[in-house]
């Protein structure tokens, strides 16, 4: 049987995801078989499990931290917002139905049974299960129907840790208010408090620690210092609010990413950040980079409509005429074609719309969703290299362009053994693919960046450091947690 530990928060972005990742890596480093778990997650950032099911990217990342093969049981319920208060409900990796909140709430008991199935599976197959809660664990207007927080600790028998972000201010009020608003049966599950993102001298918190323990009879088990050097994947698009420039700010190569209104899987661009200056651009902005990325999106037709309304379509065409490099991923790839056909308005209110026309390609929506871990080979001029990625798309594309990838596994454009498209227009290179994670393949990533290096007479790069950087940061996070938290009463 597994030992269950749960991390809940006083608010969203309190540090739950990071703390779970760090505990998973710490336990893995000690030789335990560890699984992360989040019963219900809401995110447009998702990846594909070993069963070819869809799970939130946060649980996929936590699985990597735990050195575990990502499973649908790590995130049995995934909600993907579609707009108008409706979300696509993913159950055990497979699209279940589209529901608004009231409809979803009516299915609570059915979904809770699915969650229990996953808890039973994890209990039988792992030494430790580290559970992440969602948002605040004490939204009193939602407690009756909450299947993502302390109800899960109660079901699994988990010891719970409450984490709060001191960087926001009011940390002790947040902790006290949360504890006092919780029902007694859930309050007693809390075994300790964690203060996250502290800067300064710990001595100034001593009186606060003593008072909060006196008031709640629950100890503060640690304080995690704010560490700006940690490089960790972001969980969802909230992280992009106010984020514009990141990556290697000294790099002579600039990458622009169009900030789609319903951007999805934006972490696809992260592998470029060690070598390039990265910049999100809005629909009204000019394109100033050497490489332009059209990322994934939940609604390709909506983004195409917005690009036209704001003149971004014309800016992209001018960028191509001037020799720019374009990479479209999934929804971004679809916008590069001649037409996006959505007769049933499955993508939103726009319906069928003409695309950028950079590829001789048409995409049709309303199909069964392709959810695949995929592999194949890229052959560009005299270059040949194997790549892997994952597919999450309902659009099927028929392209008359040169395929980017010959598939050995996957669905690709329309189940025809090929994925993506590739085209050279003058000095401009246009790439498109359904492969999320394409830039995690160092040979393709280096090929893309070296096109710019060659144009600018810069030194070529031959880096293969993305996975290494991830593991270094996870080990650093693990050490930070082990040095600053007393988990001895919880981890036995």
UniProtKB/Swiss-Prot annotation:
This is Probable cobyric acid synthase. Belongs to the CobB/CobQ family. CobQ subfamily. The active site is at 330 (nucleophile), 436. The lineage of its organism: Archaea, Methanobacteriati, Methanobacteriota, Methanomada group, Methanococci. InterPro entries: Class_I_gatase-like (IPR029062), CobQ/CobB/MinD/ParA_Nub-bd_dom (IPR002586), CobQ_GATase1 (IPR033949), CobQ_N (IPR047045), CobQ_synth (IPR004459), GATase_3 (IPR011698), P-loop_NTPase (IPR027417). Keywords: Cobalamin biosynthesis, Glutamine amidotransferase. Pfam families: CbiA, GATase_3. CDD domains: CobQ_N, GATase1_CobQ. The keyword S-adenosyl-L-methionine does not apply. Residues 252-444 form the GATase cobBQ-type domain.
